[in-house]
């Protein structure tokens, strides 16, 4: 069994050694330009077209939760990865716990008004503020897939009203479920904290815009943990400036790294991290990939295959 590996920033020797240990007998090599030798499987992140084109692969694994970089290239180069070759993605592999940590810590930061106290500190002003009430602090999760369900699970013990919205209906204990475009307004109405965990598809690009933000509760909060293209940043800034939004926590941006001239850097109501909310944990990812390859070699069903029409 031959496996080719390509990731522009990962520790390639670690991955090759770990995969070799997890799949005895497998020959794992780093793909470099000009390598047209046989391969059964490809593990990739933002792969060049020539890496996959013309190969009779058994499967391709995207080394992250998103596959938009591959699917966007397929629009221009459909021969890069024919339909009969399955494409898999990493839905969790440690990312779920990281998303839980990020979301819970930020929700509590806002709920306890630490953002307001930090602003008062900048003015050297001492003033105890009125507490927020849990029943008025409804949390809405856009995207109810694996990561969305993990975030809802972590928030449940804190007693906030929880709701989720997705393309097709998902049901989780203690979470009010909304689905489809017709139910989006009802989901947004009264939502105080909006957490975005949507996949990046043609339908979700620009979904968080002026029209959507205006349907949230007054003085609401936005946490974007999915993709920067989901948010129209000009509309976000307008909502912050008018007070419709009280704050935003952003991990992803329309352009990364975020340009130094972006007004997001200096906005007092915007907190930011550099796309680190959930990163691939190598050991867990290797275990999942090895297990999936073993299932495929044995003719068994494998989970987390991407539906190319849906984009996830």
UniProtKB/Swiss-Prot annotation:
A GO molecular-function descriptor: hydroxypyruvate reductase (NADH) activity
Pfam families named in the record: 2-Hacid_dh_C (PF02826)
Enzyme Commission number(s) of this protein: 1.1.1.79, 1.1.1.81
Reactions that this protein is recorded to catalyse: glycolate + NADP(+) = glyoxylate + NADPH + H(+); (R)-glycerate + NAD(+) = 3-hydroxypyruvate + NADH + H(+); (R)-glycerate + NADP(+) = 3-hydroxypyruvate + NADPH + H(+)
Keywords: Cytoplasm, NAD, NADP, Oxidoreductase
Active-site residues, Swiss-Prot/TrEMBL: 227, 275 (proton donor)
Superkingdom assignment: Bacteria
Location of the protein in the cell: Cytoplasm
Similarity remark: Belongs to the D-isomer specific 2-hydroxyacid dehydrogenase family. GhrA subfamily.
NCBIfam families documented for this protein: PRK15469.1
Protein name, as recorded: Glyoxylate/hydroxypyruvate reductase A
Source species: Enterobacter sp. (strain 638)
Higher taxonomy: Bacteria, Pseudomonadati, Pseudomonadota, Gammaproteobacteria, Enterobacterales
């Amino acid at each position: 069994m031959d496996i080719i590996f390509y990731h522009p920033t990962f520790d390639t020797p670690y991955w090759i050694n770990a995969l070799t240990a997890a799949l005895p007998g497998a020959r794992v090599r780093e793909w470099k330009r000009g390598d047209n030798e046989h391969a059964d499987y490809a593990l990739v992140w933002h792969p060049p077209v020539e890496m996959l084109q013309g190969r009779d692969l058994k499967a391709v694994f995207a080394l992250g939760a998103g596959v938009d970089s591959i699917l966007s290239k397929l629009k221009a180069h459909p021969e890069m990865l024919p339909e009969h070759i399955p494409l898999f993605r990493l839905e969790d592999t440690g990312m779920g716990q990281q998303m839980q940590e990020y979301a819970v810590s930020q929700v509590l930061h806002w709920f306890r008004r630490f953002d307001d106290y930090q602003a008062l500190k900048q003015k050297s002003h001492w003033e105890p503020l009125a507490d927020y009430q849990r029943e008025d602090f409804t949390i809405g999760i856009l995207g109810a897939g694996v990561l969305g369900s993990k975030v809802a699970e972590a928030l449940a013990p804190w007693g906030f009203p929880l709701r989720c919205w997705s393309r097709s209906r998902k049901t989780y204990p203690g979470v009010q479920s909304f689905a489809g475009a017709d139910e989006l307004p009802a989901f947004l109405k009264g939502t105080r904290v909006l957490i975005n965990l949507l996949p990046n598809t043609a339908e979700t690009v620009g979904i968080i815009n002026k029209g959507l933000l205006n349907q949230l509760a007054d003085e609401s909060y936005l946490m974007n943990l999915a993709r920067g293209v989901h948010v129209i940043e000009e509309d976000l800034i307008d909502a912050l400036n008018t007070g419709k939004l009280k704050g935003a926590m952003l991990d992803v941006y329309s352009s990364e790294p975020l340009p130094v001239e972006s007004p997001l850097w200096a906005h007092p109501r915007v907190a930011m991290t550099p796309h680190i909310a959930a990163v691939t944990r190598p050991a867990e990812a290797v275990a999942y990939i090895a297990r999936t390859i073993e299932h495929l070699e044995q003719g068994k069903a494998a989970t987390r295959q991407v539906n190319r029409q849906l984009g996830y």
